[in-house]
Swiss-Prot record:
Reactions the enzyme catalyzes: (7R,8S)-7,8-diammoniononanoate + CO2 + ATP = (4R,5S)-dethiobiotin + ADP + phosphate + 3 H(+)
Assembly notes: Homodimer.
Gene responsible for this protein: bioD2
NCBIfam families documented for this protein: bioD
Keywords on record: ATP-binding, Biotin biosynthesis, Cytoplasm, Ligase, Magnesium, Metal-binding, Nucleotide-binding
Name assigned to this protein: ATP-dependent dethiobiotin synthetase BioD 2
Coiled-coil regions, chain positions: none
Keyword DNA-binding: no
Residues at which Mg(2+) binds: T17, D55, E112
Pathway field: Cofactor biosynthesis; biotin biosynthesis; biotin from 7,8-diaminononanoate: step 1/2
InterPro entries hit by this protein: DTB_synth_BioD, P-loop_NTPase
Organism of this sequence: Salmonella typhi
């Protein structure tokens, strides 16, 4: 059965891409074929090959198949287009068709979101509405920093309110000098309604590294046998 996961974060720049990379590498090392999917990528740059986004390129680099960029990132928005003040319709059918196409080709598709759970697209709708439509199980990335406990609990509650399961969370140490790191992890472990499936240490250029060893797929249990959550 095909399996898809949606990666959300407690905020922007908390490490969704490196955690997506880690999850893809962990699944691949277990003999599964994988693909990363960045439905909407903000802050993309013009290149001779067209609009490209650095996060989507990371996902493309660890996908099992040689896929065209557009298969990984169907909507690439420039810096100007990324502003919610820039009204721009989002073709959600295009996003769904792209996800379905990837799901037909590989065992696992890791779908990376944009910003946090309620981050708005240019049509002033959160991407989470599309995630609900697709009925994708959710993994949350918590950037361990001041205030992250509040952000993590609010995100978990929002996911639950939208009727989707939070199947796990990953701690990403984005601030190596943060005091009380262990205490924060302990509190989150007690308060979040999902298992901790990995801890990523602070690593320079993490997006270029092998990260699969930091993910404990066994903590996901039977979830790996689920394609989508049935309504």
């Amino acid at each position: 059965m095909l399996k898809r996961f949606f990666i959300t974060g407690t905020d922007t720049s908390v490490g969704k891409t490196v955690v997506s990379r880690a999850l893809l590498q962990a699944l691949s090392s277990g003999g599964k074929s994988v693909a990363g999917y960045k439905p909407v990528a903000k802050g993309s740059k013009e290149t001779p090959e067209g609009m490209r986004n650095k996060d989507a390129l990371v996902l493309q680099s660890v996908s099992s198949l040689e896929l065209p960029y557009e298969a990984i990132n169907p909507i690439a928005l420039s810096e100007e287009e990324s502003s919610v003040a820039h009204s721009c319709p989002i073709n959600y059918t295009l996003l769904s068709n792209g996800l379905a196409s990837l799901s037909d080709k590989v065992d696992h598709v890791v779908v990376e979101g944009t910003g946090g759970w309620r981050s708005l697209m240019n049509d002033l709708r959160p991407l989470s509405e599309w995630v609900v439509q697709e009925q994708l199980p959710v993994l949350m990335v918590v950037g361990i920093q001041e205030g992250c406990i509040n952000h993590a609990l609010l995100t978990a509650q929002a996911v639950a309110n939208d009727g989707l399961p939070l199947i796990g969370w990953v701690a990403n140490r984005i601030n190596p000098g943060l005091a009380h790191y262990a205490e924060i992890i302990d509190v989150l472990g007690k308060k979040l309604p999902a298992p901790l499936i990995g801890e990523l240490p602070y690593l320079p250029r993490a997006e270029q590294r092998e990260l699969g060893q930091y993910i404990r797929l066994s903590m996901l249990g039977s979830v790996l046998a689920v394609d989508r959550i049935m309504a």
